């Protein structure tokens, strides 16, 4: 290139002109998007090494440090404009507060966060409610106890004021659980009144006492019969045997072989009367019983 004004002097030397042509050729490859041939780059490296050995003042291009090829110099700018930056600690939870703090726990599985921060961004109202297992939901319910009097019968013996009628108990269980809780029988579950009257406390729960004759103070001895209900293991159609109780062994009936039948249980019953409260009444009652027994013996003879 020649300078204007008729001076005839060149602005660039031959070496500089050759270098400009070489750089223009590299620029054409870069503008076309084609890869730059290695021999052109190798020539630049040799020229840079030779210039480093020479004086810095003679080579103005060496006054500025050369830039490395690639995207290294644009890393900070790329991070600011949305380009993904590699995580320096891949296995660490990425939950941060937007500043300097970062979670120190390890990431769970393939997730980027730990177990604590995995569901932090989701709506917690949609989390399924944990239901208790069916075994734990079973609650003990007490058995329903109903008491009903026996059906009235015209032929049934009447009970006095001192003896109460037997009660029938119906027990319906819900079977909600196998066993009640240990604190169930402690409070407010005991019966306030006894189920059976006090007059029948001396006898078993399955025995019923019936009177055939009225008892009078100082009167004749009453014949008592002890009825035992049929066992639930036996047939319901079998009738219960009724045996009268006698005051003396001589009054017991004899069997065919002349022996007294002792196949049953011997039971002696003493009936308290109102005469036991006063000594005079007790003496009068004993005298009246003595006379009545004598009359009974004479009648039997």
Swiss-Prot record:
A motif (Bipartite nuclear localization signal) lies at residues 83-102, 120-127. SMART domains: QLQ. Pfam families: QLQ, WRC. Belongs to the GRF family. Transcription activator that plays a regulatory role in gibberellin-induced stem elongation. PANTHER family: GROWTH-REGULATING FACTOR 2, GROWTH-REGULATING FACTOR 5. This is Growth-regulating factor 2. The gene is GRF2.
